[in-house]
Swiss-Prot record:
It is an enzyme of class 5 (isomerase). The active site is at residue 56. Its EC number is 5.4.99.12. GO terms for biological process: tRNA pseudouridine synthesis. This is tRNA pseudouridine synthase A. It catalyses: uridine(38/39/40) in tRNA = pseudouridine(38/39/40) in tRNA. Belongs to the tRNA pseudouridine synthase TruA family. The lineage of its organism: Archaea, Methanobacteriati, Methanobacteriota, Methanomada group, Methanobacteria. Coiled coil: none annotated. Formation of pseudouridine at positions 38, 39 and 40 in the anticodon stem and loop of transfer RNAs. The gene is truA. It holds the Pfam family PseudoU_synth_1. Keywords: Isomerase, tRNA processing. NCBIfam families: hisT_truA (TIGR00071). Signal peptide: none annotated.
């Protein structure tokens, strides 16, 4: 019996999070159903089915990881042919029997900011403050044994839109120029990235000082937890998870297939955008008539 790790891509908008929930569509439920259907797993305990990260509803992924044991040789495209278009296996790796995907060497999250009023210099300043080891108790909703985490790196870049996006959504991209915030670390608390992004935005628009950020990362023992509102999950992507000694091999056909699925979903978004744009235009015409 061999143990295999799989790297998963999915469109989070279509799921109620990763973890199984009664009567709700989740990524984990879809994966288990199709792996069972194809004969890769049966009993979850015997197959030692494990997951790396429980992303919230709306959060997307290009790199979440699951692992399991199976007598059957794992064939990526056989699984993808069974899975729905909004979730696909992108890569696989053989792993040791005791491998647990939650214990990663590095995780990379990307948050995409769509605001024209952001000061990029201030964004980079606040990024420098967050790098390193801190007490993130103010950046999670749950009480945990330890809230100390280390941010290895944060990269902030203006997005380069390719010709396809410019052609399909010309009006949209005339007004919105997204900023990518890529955050790297071994592990993250629940809601930590989205709360961090709220602070990033507040600093970049002049609503919050860098001194206050320092205070949030160095709370006194008896300080009440700060009420930091999370930013929307729809703009967060789990980009990658890496492990010491584990080499994932990406399947070219699987990656191309998922890319096509994403392009197809863009077409649907374009139609929805056009409908809303036509409704706005009609209302503006009414205002001129009146």
């Amino acid at each position: 019996m061999k143990r295999t790790a799989l790297k998963i891509g999915y469109i989070g908008t279509n799921f109620h999070g990763f973890q199984r929930q009664p009567d709700l569509r989740t990524v984990e439920e879809e994966l288990i159903y199709h792996l069972r259907k194809l004969g890769y797993i049966d009993d979850l305990k015997k197959s030692r089915f494990r997951i790396a990260g429980r992303t919230d509803a709306g959060v997307h992924s290009l790199g979440n990881v699951i692992s399991f044991q199976s007598e059957k040789e794992v064939r990526v495209n056989e699984i993808n042919n069974s899975l729905p278009d909004d979730i696909q296996i992108l890569a696989k790796a053989p792993v040791r029997f005791g491998f647990k995907p939650r214990y990663a060497e590095m995780r990379q999250y990307r948050y995409v900011l769509f605001r024209s009023d952001l000061d990029l210099y201030k964004l980079n300043e606040v990024a420098e403050i967050f790098k390193g080891t801190h007490n993130f108790t103010n950046f999670t909703k749950r009480f945990q044994k330890t809230t100390t985490r280390t941010i290895d790196d944060i990269k902030i870049t203006k997005a380069n839109l390719n010709d396809y996006h410019k052609k399909e959504f010309p009006n949209l991209h005339d007004t919105l120029s997204p900023v990518f915030v890529d955050i790297y670390g071994e592990s993250f608390l629940w809601n930590m990235v989205r709360k961090m992004m709220r602070v990033f935005v507040d600093v970049a628009i002049g609503k919050l000082s860098l001194e206050k950020v320092e205070e949030l990362l160095n709370p006194a023992e008896n300080d009440p937890r700060a009420n930091i509102k999370v930013l929307d999950p729809d703009y967060l992507i789990l980009m990658d998870i890496k492990y010491d000694g584990v080499k994932f091999v990406y399947d070219d056909y699987a990656c191309e297939r998922f890319k096509r699925n994403l392009v197809d979903s863009l077409g649907d978004l374009q139609r929805k955008y056009a409908i809303r744009e036509s409704m706005i235009k009609s209302l503006e015409d009414l205002e001129r008539i009146n």
